[in-house]
Amino acid sequence: MLLGLEQEFFVIPKEIYEKREDLKFAGRTLVGSPPPRNQQLGEHYYGRIPTIVEKVLSEVESELLQIGIPFKTRHNEVAVNQFEVACICDEAGVAIDQNMIMM
């Protein structure tokens, strides 16, 4: 059985992260505000990955390839500063192991 897994995550600048007690202590957003109205798809899902994030993802891809985990895709996700990476489909056991290492 082949399986293709993906990881979705947010990229938050360190200076903003350091100011957010909820992120530092709980590892997730506990306080916030509603999303802005009329978000355009071109601003996130179909938008260009910011250069600094592209650099980080290239470094991650390089590290994964060195340990034998082939990287298939990377792109923006629906929320602002949300991104996705996915490995190439593989046998279920291998794909699960690769996904756990990627996390």
Regions found by a protein language model. Name each.
Residues M1-M103:
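Glycine-rich, acidic/polar active-site loops that bind/position phosphate-bearing ligands
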